[in-house]
Amino acid sequence: MAPGPAEPPGASSPPPPQTERSRWENGWVWALAVLLPLRLLSAASAPIMDCDETFNYWEPLRYLSYQGSGGGMQTWEYSPTYALRSYLYIELHGLVLRIGRALASLDDVQSFYWLRSGLAVVSAGSEAAFCAATADSLGPRVGALTLAFMAPASGMFHASVALLPSTTCMYCVLLGFAAWLRGRHVLGLMCGSLAVLLAWPFVALAFVPMGLDALRPSALGFAGVVGVAAAAILAFGCLPALFDGWYYATGRPVSAVANLILYNALGQGGGGRGADLYGTEPFSFYVKNLLLNFNLVAPLGLLAGPALAAIPAEGRWRRLLAVSPAYLVLLLFGSMAHKEERFLTPIYPLLCLSAAAVLDTALGVAERGAVAFGLTRRPRARAVCNSLLVLLALAAAALSASRSMALHVNFRAPLRIYEHLYYHAAGPAAPPRAGSVCIGKEWYRFPSSFFLPRWGPGGAVSPLLWLNSSFTGQLPRPFEPWPGGISVVPPHMNDRNEEEPSRYSQLSDCAFVVDLELPQQEEPTLDRAAWEPLACEPFLDAERSRLPWRAFHLPFGISQRRNAYAEYCVWRRKGR
């Protein structure tokens, strides 16, 4: 394949008419105008969906960016004994944080949202480039449908602004596939290498079809692919290993990616169980999550492969090559016992592309059939088809908006509560001394130390303490004092998710307690004679709420009447 858009992978047959092409002459700008406000809205309102984001990324970022003065909790993955996470990956995000703090006087909470907004901008730009490349190479209708499916999708609502390697991989998929669709194989493969070698190695299968396509003599050829691979290994493999070796102070290069593969894929750690220690799920777990995150688009995207193979249309095998990575990644993660919703994040855009491609192909066949049967003089038939497409896109968007609204309304309480606590400490009525913030069973909804109170301008940050609860796994511990916390082997760490009793504090040590009080909880409630609520927010009680009401938000108070809610509160010890 020669470089350029003349014959990209998956190209639709004849080029679209000039009038249709002209609509996408500034396609990237138009797509960005649609996407950027939506992604910034996500940055402001999406809940943190996974405690891994908080403790493995926000917390070390907090520790590094504030050089220990802002606190920060350390997981066992950051112990030099295991070194499953890359400090270089954290520091790259820290650059964005430092730029924001240098440009403006941002407090800790504002710094959190500044970085989230930066992620939103990167996501919107990457998605816009992907949609524009799709329109140029596969046809304007495919590009428009991809944008219509992807922009409002609930999965993109929360995944686009997550501080997670899987989200970084999604950005790389978007930019890499945009380059590939335009015939720029070197750029596409470098994006894939960045994703695999620096962010998350398990996304490698998503770039296999691109690599195979690049092997053709008319593309890069074997020698060209080997050259790109060598440059990528040096830039994204060797240099990060040297950087992390310096941070972990091991005296040798440290490849967090290699350690991650050994632990998760080969089971070398965790008593031989690897990631399975943290729970296993059937394949239906992914089916359910895809339906929740993409509703009508999910079955279309999943059926795209068989449908494209079965429908006789020019260029179908090229389109199959473009959508095949989604199936490879889904099969890989579906075959693994340990499953997480975020594992499928890198293929979210490809799912939207697959759905758009199969609809465009089917309509193209129908249009050619209309020509064959002399029905081209019946514009009503074409208008009906286009109207059905618009209705499908609107229905998918409405369901996605309902789902995203449900996530925001039902699970926004932790961010709001901790934000209230932070600004309470900064207010004139705050007590003159710092107090510890304690969490029991709600540890996994802690949004990060960016929300811990700072008592007075530049004052001390409240310590975060754990209270014993029904949870019996291993909790994070505070980093050692700066700068030793990066390289010192912390005590009482294990890779088997075994409970460490040394983590727990007593209620008497607490000035504030954050808790969700549920009717069915095992833990005792706080003594009202000693504690008073500082702030409370409603939080969905999932066990007492039924589908579909808890999964989708309906207006006019319908969801509130159908669902059960509990109070998510920050409690203050009386007398403070």
Residues covered by each model-derived region:
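Membrane-embedded, lumen/periplasm-facing catalytic core of multi-pass transferases
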Residues: 366-517, 531-541, 547-575
